[in-house]
Curated annotation (Swiss-Prot):
Entry protein name: DNA damage-binding protein 1
Induction comment from the UniProt entry of this chain: Down-regulated in response to UV-damage followed by an increase in transcription back to basal level. Shows slight increase in transcription following cisplatin treatment.
Pathway per the UniProt entry: Protein modification; protein ubiquitination
Organism: Dictyostelium discoideum (Social amoeba)
Coiled coil segments of this chain: none
Compositional bias segments (type: Low complexity): 449-465, 891-900
InterPro entries membership: Beta-prop_RSE1/DDB1/CPSF1_1st, Cleavage/polyA-sp_fac_asu_C, Quinoprotein_ADH-like_sf, RSE1/DDB1/CFT1/CPSF1, WD40/YVTN_repeat-like_dom_sf, WD40_repeat_dom_sf
Spans annotated as Disordered: 150-187, 449-468, 882-902
Length: 1181
C-alpha cells in the first residue's frame, strides 16, 4: 500500500507573533507562526499587507525577532519542537530569505521539560537562552560587534551553499548549515553554544532583564512543595556558567505563571489572581479577577503599558505609573472582548493583532473612549479565519452533486463554532429570470462618466474581460440570443425589458459596451459595427461588412476594435473628433481564426493595447501581433488536434500572462516578456473535459478569470502564485461582473435556461463558512441523513468567579449539551442538556436489526463526580424537524427522562449505565458497539415479548485493551485504536461475539484510525505520525497471521483527532479508476488527504521527491528527510511508502531550470512531470 499525503488547507492556528523591521530598514513587519509555517506581513497606512509565507520543516516552538549592533534590519530566531534552531535574515534587494545560522540543540542525555520549551533573547542582542531539558540551559552567544558589511561579505564567501528562499514556499532554497557539534564559528551572528547547569528543575517561565551590563535572566520555578519562587542569574563572560544574580524572591504565589520583562527594570509576575512588579527593591501589586492569562504585549517603548489577554477572551491593560524610572503603582482595567489569544502584538496607533489558536485571529483598534453600547474600548477591524483546533468533523454531500463538504467542530469554548468547508467558490443567488438560449450578456452603466466594460470583449470565445473593471453603477444588461437582442433595465431590485432606439435588436449581438471618454455605446453584430450616443441612444455611426462576409469574432478595448472575418484580421479605431469608425489595418492569415483578444494586460489602466493575440484553426497555433501594424511577433505551436477556443491576456501580481484554452478542457498558460515580445514558461493543465471560455471579472478591486466549462473555475493569484478554484455551478454559458444599485458587487450568470444575478464568495481555494455556537465548543458531530440534520455534542464553560479571586479552588463549571441543527439552514432544532458532571464523548446515528425504518441517535458519556467515575449510553429518537432560536426553551428537563417528543425535539428512549466512560460508539451490522474503557459492549434494541415493548440490552463482547479511543468497521471487521496498544483487528463471529485475529505489537499511542480497505489500515498517533499496518492473509505461519505488520510510516507533524473517508473534489467524467482517499483534520487547523496510489505512481513520485530534495532546500537548513521520518519517544525511522504531496506540488512553481534538475534522473521532461502531477492532484484535492 502506497500513500500520497497532500495538504488541502495549511494550518490556520496562530501560535506566535512578533513585530519588527525584518524585510527592510524602514519596513514595519508582523510575523506570525502557524505550527509549521511563518507568514510575513507589511504594516502600512492601509493595514496589514501579506508579503509571503515560508514552510518550516518542524513544529515551531520559539519565534523571536532581535537586532544586533550595526544592523539596520532585525533577525528572526526560530526553534522547533525537535530541537532544531536557525537564525534568518531577509535580503530586501534580492527579496530572499537568508539563513545566517542553524544547528541542532538536541542532547543525548537529559529529560525534556514538562512545561514546554522556552526560548529567550537578551534585549541587547548578546545571547539566546534555550531551556529544553530539565536542569540545563543552552546558551547561544551572538556576535554583537558586526557591521552589515561584515555580514554580507561573510555571506558572499559562502555563496555556493547559500542559495536562498524566494517567496514561494521554499523554492530553490539552499542554506548555510552551521553544525554546532563541530563548533563552526564562521557565522557572523552565532559565535558559540554552551550548556550550563540550572539548579531549578521545574522551570515555569524565564526572561532576560533590561538594563543589565551582564546578560541577566530571571527564572520562575516550582519547588517540591509546589511553592513558586524567582531566582536571577548573571551569565558569565565566558558563557560557561551561571552566577547568582542581583536579587531573588521567594513565595511569589502558587498561581504565578508568567514573567514579563519591564524596560524600566525588573519583571512583572503574572498570576491568575493578580500581577506583581518586582525588581529586588520595590514590590507593587494589583489584584485581578480570577483568570488565566495566556498572552501579553508591550505597548510603549518604556514599558509603562502592557496588554494582557486571558482564557475568557478578555483584553486588559496594565499601566505602570512611574517617576524617574521608579514604579510607584499598578493600575489594571478590562478593555473588551477578543478571541482567546495565543499571542498579542501591538502594531501602531492603537492597532493590535490578536493571534489565536482557539478562534479567528483579529486585527483590532483600541479607542480612547469607551463605547457605551458595547461597554468596550475595542473596535474590530478584520478577522483572519482559523478552523483550528478541529476536534471532530463529518463529510457530507449536502447538495447530492457528487462533491462533499466538511463540517467541523472548531475552536474552543467561547470561540467554538461549526465550520462548513468545501472546495471551490459558491454563488449566492439574488435574482433569477427564466430565459433560454442566452448567447451573450453585456452590462451597460448608468452614464458615460465611468465605464464598467471598457476593455476587450469577444463573441464566440466570450472574453468579456473588462466587465466591472470600474466601480460605476450598471443600469442595463444587454442579452444576446441567436436571432435577437434584448435590453433589461434595472431599477433597484426591479427588472424590466426596455429598448434602445439605435440598437440593432433583430439580430444577435457579438459585443455591446460603452466607450466612456467618447460618450458612446458600441454594438457589434455579425454584419456591422454601430456607434450609439449614450445619452440619446441614437445611432451616430455605422460600419457594415460586405454582404458576402460575416464577422465571426470580436474583441475591444475602449476605442480599439479587432475582429475576424474568416481568415482576415481587421483592426479599427474610433475617431474621437467625428466619432467615426476607421479601419486601420487588415491582414489575411493562413487559417481561420478561432479566438481573439485585444485586452491590455493591466485591465485597471486606461491605456491602449499594444498587442492582439489570436488562436488559429488547422495549424493549432497561438499568434501575437503588434498594433497598429498587425506585424506578427510570435508564433507558438500548441500541438495536438484540438482547436484553441478562447485566449486572454492578463496581469497578475505584475506578471504578464497569456492563457489559451482548448476544446477538450485543457488550458495553456504562458508568461509574456514585454521587453523581448516573447512567450516563455509554457504550462498545460486540465480544468475539465469540455471547451473552456475565458472571461475576466472584477471582485474587490482585483481582476480574475472565470473559466466557463463543465467544471467552472476561477483563476486567481496570491503571492505571485496562480490558483484554480472550482465554482459550484452547473450549465454555465456566460458570466460578467454586474454592479447596480439593487445588486451591488454581483455577477450576472447565464445558464442554458436562465439568467441569474448573484454574489460570489471570497475567492480562495477552500470556502469556509462559520456557524457560531454561541460561546459553546463543539466536541463531536454526525450527520443524520434521514432527518436532514446534524447532531452535535457541545460544551459550555460558564465564567464563574468574575467578581474576585476569593474562591480560587473552585473550577469553572462545564455543561454539556446535545444540539440538533438543520443541515441546510443550521437553525437549532432541538437540544438536550446532560446531567451535572456529565460530558458527551461520542455520538453516532444507528439502526438496529429488525427495524430498517427508524434511525436512532446514540450518545456515549463520561460522568466524573467528586466521588466516582462512570458513563452512560443514551438512545434518542428524533421527530419531524421544527426550528427555534431559543436554546433555553429547547433544553430538556434532566429530571424527566421521558421529555416531550414534540416536533423537533429529541426523545430519550433508553439509557444504559456503565462503570466507566463510554469513549466511542460504532453502528455495526444492526447493533451498537460501545467502547467502555478497556472493553467492548454490544448493545441491542429489540422487542420484548414479556414487556410488549422495545428494550435495550448490552453484553460484553471483547476485553483486554488498555483504553479504547477509536473504532472503525468494514463488513464484519472492527479496527480498534487503543491509547497505548496501537491497533488490533476483530472479526464478528456467528454468535455475535468479537474475536481478535490480529494486532500490531508496537507501543503506539493511537488518536484516530481508518480502514483503507480490507487489508490495510491507517492510524494517527500521539507523536504526530501516520502508521499503516497490513493484515497477513497470505502467510502460512499462524503467528505471523496474528500480527498487523507495519508497512508504512510518515511524520505528518500535526496532531490528528479525526480521519474520514471522502473527498472534497467533484470528479470529472473519466474512465480512470477512483483513487481511494481519506480526509484528516488537525488541532492546528489544517485539512489534508491521504490518497492510495499505485506502485508505478509511487516509484515515479519517490524519484521526483528525491530530485526535489536536491533542488528545494529547507529554510534554516532543516532537512526534509529528517522532518518526514517517523519519530516518537521510542525510536526514529525513515519515512516508508509515503509521498509528501506538498513537496511534490512545489515542482509546479519551480523555474524551468530547477525543474530540469529535479527530473534529471527520471528520463522525462518537466512537462511530462507537470502533467502527471496535475493528473493526480485533480482527483485528490
Amino acid at each position: 500500500m502506497y500513500n500520497f499525503v497532500s495538504t488541502v488547507q495549511k494550518p490556520t492556528s496562530v501560535t506566535h507573533s512578533v513585530t519588527g523591521n525584518f524585510t527592510g530598514p524602514n519596513d514595519k513587519n508582523l510575523i506570525i507562526s502557524k505550527c509549521t509555517k511563518i507568514e510575513i506581513f507589511l504594516m502600512d497606512q492601509d493595514g496589514l499587507k501579506p508579503m509571503f509565507d515560508v514552510n518550516i520543516y518542524g513544529r515551531i516552538s520559539v519565534l523571536k525577532l532581535f537586532s544586533v549592533a550595526g544592523s539596520k534590519q532585525d533577525y528572526l530566531f526560530i526553534s522547533t519542537e525537535s530541537f532544531k534552531f536557525c537564525i534568518l535574515a531577509y535580503d530586501y534587494e534580492k527579496k530572499e530569505i537568508i539563513t545566517k545560522a542553524s544547528g541542532n540543540a538536541e542532547d543525548t542525555i537529559g529529560r525534556p521539560t514538562e512545561a514546554g520549551q522556552l526560548g529567550i533573547i537578551d534585549p541587547d542582542g548578546r545571547i539566546v537562552a534555550l531551556h529544553l531539558y530539565e536542569g540545563l540551559l543552552k546558551l547561544i552567544t551572538l556576535d554583537n560587534n558586526n557591521t552589515p558589511n561584515k555580514i554580507n561579505n561573510n555571506n558572499n564567501n559562502n555563496n555556493n551553499n547559500n542559495n536562498n528562499n524566494n517567496n514561494n514556499n521554499n523554492n530553490n532554497i539552499n542554506n548555510n548549515n552551521f553544525n554546532i557539534n563541530n563548533n563552526n564559528n564562521n557565522s557572523p551572528i552565532q559565535k558559540n553554544v554552551n550548556n550550563v547547569r540550572l539548579e531549578e528543575l521545574q522551570v515555569l517561565d524565564m526572561t532576560f532583564l533590561y538594563g543589565c551590563k551582564v546578560p541577566t535572566i530571571a527564572v520562575l520555578f516550582k519547588d517540591t512543595k509546589d511553592e513558586k519562587h524567582i531566582s536571577t542569574y548573571e551569565i558569565s563572560s565566558k558563557d560557561t556558567e551561571l552566577v547568582v544574580g542581583p536579587w531573588s524572591q521567594s513565595n511569589v504565589g502558587v498561581y504565578s505563571s508568567l514573567l514579563v520583562p519591564v524596560p524600566l527594570g525588573g519583571v512583572l509576575v503574572v498570576a491568575d489572581n493578580g500581577i506583581t512588579y518586582l525588581n529586588g527593591k520595590v514590590t507593587r501589586s494589583v489584584a485581578v479577577s480570577y483568570t488565566k492569562f495566556l498572552a501579553f504585549t508591550r505597548v510603549d517603548k518604556d514599558g509603562s503599558r502592557f496588554l494582557f489577554g486571558d482564557h475568557f477572551g478578555r483584553l486588559s491593560v496594565l499601566v505602570l505609573i512611574h517617576q524617574q524610572q521608579k514604579v510607584m503603582e499598578l493600575k489594571f482595567e478590562q478593555l473588551g472582548r477578543i478571541s482567546i489569544p495565543s499571542s498579542i502584538s501591538y502594531l501602531d496607533s492603537g492597532v493590535v493583532y490578536i493571534g489565536s489558536s482557539s478562534g479567528d485571529s483579529q486585527l483590532i483598534r483600541l479607542n480612547t473612549e469607551k463605547d457605551q453600547t458595547t461597554d468596550s474600548y475595542v473596535t474590530y477591524l478584520e478577522a483572519f479565519t482559523n478552523i483550528g483546533p478541529v476536534v471532530d468533523f463529518c463529510v457530507v454531500d449536502a447538495e447530492k452533486q457528487g462533491q462533499a463538504q466538511i463540517v467541523t467542530c472548531s475552536g474552543t469554548y467561547r470561540d467554538g463554532s461549526l465550520r462548513i468547508i468545501r472546495n471551490g467558490i459558491g454563488i449566492a443567488e439574488q435574482a433569477s429570470i427564466e430565459l433560454e438560449g442566452i448567447k451573450g450578456i453585456f452590462p451597460i452603466n448608468n452614464n458615460n462618466n465611468n465605464n464598467n466594460n471598457n476593455n476587450n470583449n469577444n463573441n464566440n470565445n466570450n472574453n468579456n474581460n473588462s466587465n466591472g473593471i470600474t466601480d460605476s453603477k450598471d443600469r442595463y444588461l444587454i442579452t444576446s440570443f441567436i436571432e435577437c437582442t434584448k435590453v433589461l433595465s434595472f431599477q433597484g431590485e426591479e427588472i424590466e425589458e426596455t429598448e434602445f432606439e439605435g440598437l440593432e435588436s433583430n439580430c444577435s449581438t457579438l459585443y455591446c459596451g460603452t466607450i466612456d471618454k467618447l460618450n458612446l455605446l458600441i454594438q457589434i453584430t455579425n454584419v456591422s459595427i454601430n456607434l450609439i450616443d449614450s445619452n440619446t441612444f441614437k445611432r451616430v455611426s455605422q460600419w457594415n461588412v460586405e454582404p458576402s462576409r460575416r464577422i465571426n469574432l470580436v474583441s475591444t478595448n475602449q476605442d480599439q476594435i479587432v475582429l475576424s472575418i474568416d481568415k482576415s484580421l481587421l483592426y479599427f479605431q474610433i475617431n474621437s473628433s467625428n466619432k467615426s469608425i476607421q479601419l486601420v489595418k487588415e491582414i489575411e492569415l493562413p487559417h481561420e481564426i478561432s479566438c481573439i483578444d485585444i485586452s491590455p494586460f493591466d485591465s485597471f489602466m486606461d491605456t491602449k493595447s499594444q498587442l492582439v493575440s489570436v488562436g488559429l484553426w488547422n495549424d493549432i497555433t497561438l499568434r501575437i501581433f503588434k498594433l497598429p501594424t498587425l506585424e506578427e511577433i510570435w508564433k507558438e505551436p500548441l500541438g495536438g488536434e484540438i482547436l484553441p477556443r478562447s485566449i486572454l491576456m492578463i496581469s497578475f501580481d505584475s506578471i504578464d500572462y497569456i492563457f489559451c484554452s482548448l476544446g477538450d478542457g485543457h488550458l495553456f498558460k504562458f508568461q509574456f516578456d514585454f521587453s523581448s515580445f516573447k512567450l516563455f514558461d509554457k504550462r498545460k493543465l486540465t480544468l475539465g473535459t469540455q471547451p473552456i471560455i475565458l472571461k475576466k471579472f472584477k471582485l474587490k478591486n482585483t481582476i480574475n478569470i472565470f473559466a466557463i466549462s463543465d467544471r467552472p473555475t476561477v483563476i486567481y493569484s496570491h503571492n505571485k502564485k496562480l490558483f484554480y478554484s472550482v465554482v459550484n455551478l452547473k450549465d454555465v454559458t456566460n458570466v460578467t461582473s454586474f454592479n447596480s444599485d439593487g445588486f451591488p458587487n454581483s455577477m450576472a450568470i447565464a445558464t442554458t435556461n436562465s439568467l441569474t444575478i448573484g454574489t460570489i464568495d471570497e475567492i480562495q481555494k477552500l470556502h469556509i463558512k462559520t456557524i457560531p455556537l454561541n460561546e459553546e465548543m463543539g466536541r463531536r458531530i454526525v450527520h443524520l441523513e434521514d432527518h436532514s440534520c446534524y447532531a452535535v455534542i457541545t460544551v459550555k464553560n460558564n465564567e464563574g468567579l468574575l467578581g474576585g479571586a476569593q474562591d480560587l479552588c473552585e473550577e469553572d463549571e462545564e455543561v454539556s449539551y446535545i444540539r440538533i441543527y438543520n443541515d441546510q439552514t443550521f437553525e437549532l432544532i432541538s437540544s438536550y442538556k446532560l446531567d451535572p458532571y456529565e460530558m458527551g464523548w461520542s455520538i453516532t446515528p444507528c439502526k438496529f436489526a429488525g427495524d430498517d425504518v427508524n434511525t436512532y441517535l446514540a450518545v456515549g458519556t463520561s460522568i466524573n463526580t467528586p466521588i466516582k467515575s462512570s458513563g452512560r449510553v443514551l438512545l434518542f429518537s428524533l421527530s419531524s424537524s421544527s426550528s427555534s432560536n431559543d436554546k433555553d426553551s429547547l433544553d430538556n428537563n434532566n429530571n424527566n427522562n421521558n421529555n416531550s417528543g414534540a416536533n423537533g425535539k429529541l426523545t430519550l428512549l433508553e439509557e444504559i449505565k456503565f462503570r466507566s466512560s463510554v469513549y466511542f460508539l460504532l453502528s455495526f451490522n444492526g447493533r451498537l458497539i460501545a467502547a467502555v474503557h478497556k472493553r467492548l459492549f454490544s448493545i441491542r434494541y429489540t422487542h420484548s415479548k414479556e414487556k410488549n415493548c422495545k428494550v435495550i440490552s448490552s453484553e460484553s463482547v471483547h476485553k483486554g485493551h488498555t483504553m479504547i479511543l477509536k473504532l472503525a468497521s468494514r463488513g464484519h471487521f472492527i479496527l480498534v485504536g487503543d491509547m497505548m496498544k496501537s491497533m488490533s483487528l476483530l472479526v464478528e463471529q456467528s454468535d455475535g461475539s468479537l474475536e481478535q485475529i490480529a494486532r500490531n505489537p508496537q507501543p503506539i499511542w493511537i488518536r484516530s484510525v481508518a480502514m483503507i480497505n480490507d487489508d490495510y489500515f491507517i492510524g494517527a498517533e500521539a507523536s504526530n505520525n501516520f502508521i499503516v499496518v497490513k493484515k497477513n492473509n497470505d502467510s502460512t505461519n499462524e503467528l505471523e497471521r496474528e500480527l498487523l505488520d507495519s508497512v508504512g510510516h510518515y511524520h505528518i507533524g500535526e496532531s490528528i483527532n479525526s480521519m474520514r473517508h471522502g473527498s472534497l473534489v467533484r470528479l470529472p467524467d473519466s474512465d480512470q479508476p477512483i483513487i481511494p482517499t481519506i480526509l484528516y483534520a488537525s488541532v492546528n487547523g489544517s485539512i489534508g488527504v491521504v490518497a492510495s496510489i499505485s506502485e508505478e505512481d509511487f516509484i515515479f513520485f519517490s524519484k521526483l521527491q528525491k530530485g526535489l530534495n536536491q533542488v528545494v532546500r529547507g529554510v534554516g537548513g532543516f532537512s526534509h528527510e529528517t522532518w518526514r521520518a517517523f519519530s516518537n519517544d521510542h525510536h526514529t525511522i525513515d519515512s516508508k511508502n509515503f509521498i509528501d504531496g506538498d513537496l511534490i506540488e512545489t515542482f509546479l512553481d519551480l523555474k524551468y531550470e530547477s525543474q530540469l534538475k529535479a527530473v534529471a534522473d527520471l528520463g522525462i521532461t518537466p512537462d511530462d512531470a507537470f502533467r502527471r502531477i496535475e493528473s493526480l492532484m485533480q482527483y485528490i484535492r
